[in-house]
């Protein structure tokens, strides 16, 4: 295998160099191995009918390649989660050859982790890393994560009733109230609520593309030609923020787009004030419930308070009603008394 350098003659990129790798077969024919050295080494080994280089078959090199080539193509939150998961996996698996991984090793890792839910996420990421390594030709083994039992997970079942909602809402700043109302009426995730814009309003709909699933929704702003609750809210927000040039629906008092940290700070302040008020009135149970209330609980609150499960699933962007029912509906079924 040899490499060839080529310099750019472009005025836009003067002095830039490209490196390509080539294989010369028995007839003297040049076969391109690409521009990536690791890829070139693998192709060279295949052409020579030799074992793949050992260093490329260690999990450290495979994790490195996954971080370089795969993670950047994912959404921002998934990138952050995957990097954290791989960072946790590395001390255990970095020095292991990929072909040495077994279901028993994966199960032992699962059992050794004190954070049981995080262990499930880490093993899921490891499984995808292994599948990519198969595609890259670094192993022909079956995925060792397949068939390994996951730790049991209990979906969060907190429900913010009206008593909790009203006291936190009273303590909220105007922009936090807007965020709470918008999250409740649209049923969307906090990250999606914060990026809603005035120019997302098209033809009587608020157009939403969910960041997590890329699902597209058009949420109605009118019902039978009359503004519904969401339509009225957006008009009120637009009127209140008319002096600010920002296109975002939720902005601070100074007209700046509400960031996740700004939302978190305002939420913590309002919740703390609400908790103090409940304790001052001697209602420790309400204070505890207020302390457990997270902004993300607004989405399941919205789902729980829509009577029709199909309507709730549609608003949340779910393709299957059982996901909505199992994870997001947090109030019990209505039952009649015995008499």
Model segments located where?
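C-terminal catalytic core of tyrosine-transesterase DNA break-rejoin enzymes
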Residues: 117, 177-181, 185, 191-192, ...
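DNA/chromatin major-groove-contacting recognition/catalytic segments
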Residues: 164-167, 217-223, 229-235, 314, ...
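Short basic/aromatic active-site micro-motif
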Residues: 101, 260, 280-307, 323
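Short, polar N-cap/turn motifs at the start of nucleic acid-interacting alpha helices
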Residues: 200-203, 308-328
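C-terminal catalytic core of Y-nucleophile DNA break-rejoin enzymes
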Residues: 32, 213-235, 245-269
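Basic, Lys/Arg- and aromatic-enriched nucleic-acid-binding interface segment
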Residues: 116, 120-122, 135, 139-140, ...
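N-terminal DNA-binding module of tyrosine recombinases/phage integrases
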Residues: 13-104, 243
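N-terminal core-binding DNA-recognition domain of tyrosine site-specific recombinases/integrases
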Residues: 32, 68-132, 138, 257-262, ...
